[in-house]
């Protein structure tokens, strides 16, 4: 939430270069961490630096290009989003398996340094800056509210819903978020303006993106677990299975950006969400005999749907805002996607765990087996039942996203309103 204030108050170069420096320092600390506490602090520092990058990139696109030009450039934005999942899991899996976890930081550090040098040379300042006063109370409420919610939700998969720390941090987080919203409504220059929700199409778009992220991030977290735990493959294998899908999404993001300029968001998002619904349904019937080639193919087709459904909606949503609300819209989009992704991961992992624990085997399915063999089969079936339940949740969420696309306005109607 702080990114809107930072982007509006400071220049593009100041924000980007500072973000890269902070991320670089966090990366160095992570690589040389002597214990888990230091590693956790390093990851927080990294997040402080990288958290501003996506809203800054989106705001820059909105500031530079007119609404009718943004489709292809938002597609390039999607390319960046797609390439990270394409490279990250595969590279990290290889480094962890064949070197050690510190290598993750050693590889990223020089890339960060090169990025800083390139930014120093090429990045120019864009947009109009607003010298708004710093409201300390808003900053505190924002950190306590969104930080508490994210911590609580992300802890569900390890500690469960009934854990007092989880419940208290989520409840307190919600209370502080409500207080944060109340505070913003009373400030002349808010830290994060909630006026963006006065536009119904922006609200619908944000809802679609949030619901889609719940399904997308949740599935992307759980699918590698299925590959490793059920199919008995290595972390490198799980990364390679997801690699084609991430590459396809990166390419399709550019294509969908150009298609948006011709067809608008409504048609593309409907087709995209339908593809995602159908392909996610396949995950509900996977078992220990599932072919990794088939799984990789289905996942790649699913990512075509994600690219068609997500990027045009993102462009359509941001096009609804006036220039002075661009930074607030970008920050709101990024914040809600982060929260939704955490909810998706926590939701799927929790359902998976609970369903596995409550699996009731049918004795007739294991007749003639030795006790050791029978216990092994029951354990595998319990895991598969858990994964099926988790992915069924993802299917239901995706159907909700599909239904929401019907609330988007047609391109023809939007053109008539603009004239």
Enumerate the language-model features and the residues they cover:
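Residue-level hotspots within pore-lining transmembrane alpha-helices
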Residues: 29, 33, 45, 49, ...
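Select subsegments of transmembrane alpha-helices in polytopic membrane proteins
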Residues: 135-143, 269-271
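12-transmembrane solute porter fold
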Residues: 8, 13-16, 20, 107, ...
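Structural signature of transmembrane alpha-helices in multi-pass secondary transporters
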Residues: 23, 46-47, 75-85, 89, ...
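Intrinsic disorder in cytosolic terminal tails and internal cytosolic loops
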Residues: 368-380, 408-419
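Membrane-interface helix caps and helix-loop-helix hairpins in membrane proteins
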Residues: 36, 127-132, 156-162, 288-289
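Helix-loop junctions on the cytosolic side of multi-pass membrane transporters
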Residues: 117-136, 182-191, 406-416
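Helix-loop-helix hairpins in multi-pass membrane proteins, especially solute transporters
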Residues: 1-137
């Amino acid at each position: 939430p702080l990114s809107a204030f930072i982007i509006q108050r400071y220049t593009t170069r100041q924000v980007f270069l500072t973000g890269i420096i902070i991320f670089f320092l966090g990366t160095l600390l992570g690589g040389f961490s002597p214990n888990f506490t230091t590693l956790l602090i390093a990851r927080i520092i990294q997040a402080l630096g990288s958290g501003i990058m996506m809203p800054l990139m989106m705001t820059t696109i909105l500031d530079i290009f007119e609404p009718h030009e943004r489709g292809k450039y938002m597609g390039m934005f999607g390319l960046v989003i797609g390439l990270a999942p394409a490279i990250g899991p595969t590279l990290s899996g290889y480094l962890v398996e064949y070197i050690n976890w510190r290598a993750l930081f050693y590889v990223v550090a020089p890339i960060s340094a090169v990025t800083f040098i390139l930014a120093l040379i090429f990045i120019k300042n864009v947009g109009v800056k607003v010298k708004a006063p710093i409201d300390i109370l808003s900053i505190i409420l924002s950190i306590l509210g969104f930080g508490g919610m994210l911590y609580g939700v992300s802890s569900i998969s390890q500690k469960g819903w009934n854990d007092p720390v989880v419940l208290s941090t989520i409840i307190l987080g919600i209370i502080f978020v409500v207080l944060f919203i109340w505070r913003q409504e009373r400030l002349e220059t808010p830290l994060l303006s909630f006026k963006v929700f006065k536009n119904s199409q922006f609200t619908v778009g944000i809802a679609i993106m949030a619901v889609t992220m719940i399904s997308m991030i949740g599935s992307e977290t759980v699918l590698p677990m299925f590959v490793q735990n059920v199919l008995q493959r290595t972390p490198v294998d799980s990364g390679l299975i997801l690699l084609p899908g991430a590459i396809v999404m990166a390419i399709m993001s550019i294509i969908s950006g150009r298609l948006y300029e011709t067809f608008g968001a409504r048609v593309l998002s409907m087709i995209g969400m339908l593809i995602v619904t159908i392909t996610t349904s396949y995950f509900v019937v996977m078992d220990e005999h599932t072919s990794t080639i088939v799984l990789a193919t289905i996942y790649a087709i699913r990512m075509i749907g994600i690219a068609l459904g997500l990027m045009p909606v993102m462009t359509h949503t941001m096009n609804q805002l006036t220039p002075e609300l661009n930074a607030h819209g970008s920050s709101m989009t990024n914040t809600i996607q982060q929260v939704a992704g955490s909810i998706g991961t926590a939701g799927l992992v929790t359902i998976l765990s609970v369903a596995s624990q409550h699996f009731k085997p049918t004795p007739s399915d294991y007749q003639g087996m030795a006790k050791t063999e029978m216990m092994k089969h029951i354990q595998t079936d319990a895991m598969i039942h858990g994964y099926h339940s988790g992915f069924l949740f993802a299917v239901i969420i995706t159907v909700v996203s599909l239904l929401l696309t019907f609330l988007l306005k047609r391109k023809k109607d939007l053109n008539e309103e603009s004239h």
